Amino acid sequence: MSPWSWFLLQTLCLLPTGAASRRGAPGTANCELKPQQSELNSFLWTIKRDPPSYFFGTIHVPYTRVWDFIPDNSKEAFLQSSIVYFELDLTDPYTISALTSCQMLPQGENLQDVLPRDIYCRLKRHLEYVKLMMPLWMTPDQRGKGLYADYLFNAIAGNWERKRPVWVMLMVNSLTEVDIKSRGVPVLDLFLAQEAERLRKQTGAVEKVEEQCHPLNGLNFSQVIFALNQTLLQQESLRAGSLQIPYTTEDLIKHYNCGDLSSVILSHDSSQVPNFINATLPPQERITAQEIDSYLRRELIYKRNERIGKRVKALLEEFPDKGFFFAFGAGHFMGNNTVLDVLRREGYEVEHAPAGRPIHKGKSKKTSTRPTLSTIFAPKVPTLEVPAPEAVSSGHSTLPPLVSRPGSADTPSEAEQRFRKKRRRSQRRPRLRQFSDLWVRLEESDIVPQLQVPVLDRHISTELRLPRRGHSHHSQMVASSACLSLWTPVFWVLVLAFQTETPLL
């Protein structure tokens, strides 16, 4: 899930105490569903070739909040494509284990050993408050489905004293009432990954967990302490009733559904990164904030978009006869130096596909019975997966290769072996921990007490790594995403996931 974007922090700002009364307008995310398909907002772009491939901008929120507003041609493009790529492989157990490892302090170290005493005590006090409030924050529907407060708290904050400070900061920002209430329903990108797997599509990822994780771990200690302190200040102000959050997940959903997300982002900063430098900060803290801003812009936006774009290009050239559906955080397609810009510089024609425009079918394929939109995408009642104390089985069976070498129907080429996707075993035991338990939603973090630009995108990543035939966790890495896909604060991170049923998220 990111971030995973994987993970971008939501920029929140500290406002005068009197402004707090404005908090929590519940109807802000509501948007009237347009009667005509052509009136819906579209986050679909077509890569013009035969067969065509597509970019689709996702958002890291429960899919049920946005699904009815996604145009039919976007859903049809998903069905028509034989290969679906995400920022990260949200269904691969390796993603979970890699996230866990990335977030942990070196062996033998604990937070109490590395944090200043006053910050550690404030952090511990805040987590005790959250644990106390968790039963009150949960909805009757969540409790009715067997989700318990203690389980949920431990799934999110378990072993927090062993985590690196930067990940604790992100964790704190995912332990809010709004986020807790949203758990139990897959976020949009995870839902698409589950559907792709259910439909036996070949899937892959353009990024690896490490690519989203390492940039965050690359911040120096003083920068991380600055960010964690600002985060705790914000949460303490929220508890005291003196803080108003100007942009929330509800606002993000409204902008995504109603079609003004781009204008919101671009009106703040065309580069998608918030100018989170607060003029009220002391001079030295302003310098620290500027350093973080510069580092995150470079590592999490510009370098990432360039890397993802080149990996997409490599896939398109490797398999010219295959139709791809690339589902990345919508923030990757907005502003300057986007993934779209990278592909266009490489000579590809990429155009926006408005809602209501028919999808080009491309080369004729063997006739086969294909599910309809109504049967595939009928929203289902989400089921909560309760982890059992058993480990994931490492075995799996593989699907037949979807890519055939010209002139050889039996012998798979080396390229074919790269893109085989494992099929999840139907009898696999439940996982001990879930993807959402490990990713932290960056979208709603706020490191600097000042509102910045909302940025959608929740995942980040690194090197090109392709699985070999028979590779157990089969993490096909040719790029990645998350999605971190929400808002961006001083501390841009990944939104592949640590929040909803599986952000960052």
UniProtKB/Swiss-Prot annotation:
Q: Give one Pfam family, short name only.
A: TraB_PrgY_gumN
A single GO CC term for this protein reads: organelle membrane
Does the keyword section mention Transmembrane?
Answer: yes
CDD domains documented for this protein: Tiki
The free-text note explaining how the cofactor binds reads: Divalent metal cations. Mn(2+) or Co(2+).
Residues bearing attached sugar chains per UniProt: N220, N229, N278, N336
Q: What is its main location?
A: membrane
Function, please? Metalloprotease that acts as a negative regulator of the Wnt signaling pathway by mediating the cleavage of the 8 N-terminal residues of a subset of Wnt proteins. Following cleavage, Wnt proteins become oxidized and form large disulfide-bond oligomers, leading to their inactivation. Able to cleave WNT3A, WNT5, but not WNT11. Required for head formation.
Q: What else is known?
A: Was named TIKI in reference to large-headed humanoid in Polynesian mythology.
This protein's name = Metalloprotease TIKI1
Give the gene symbol. Answer: TRABD2A
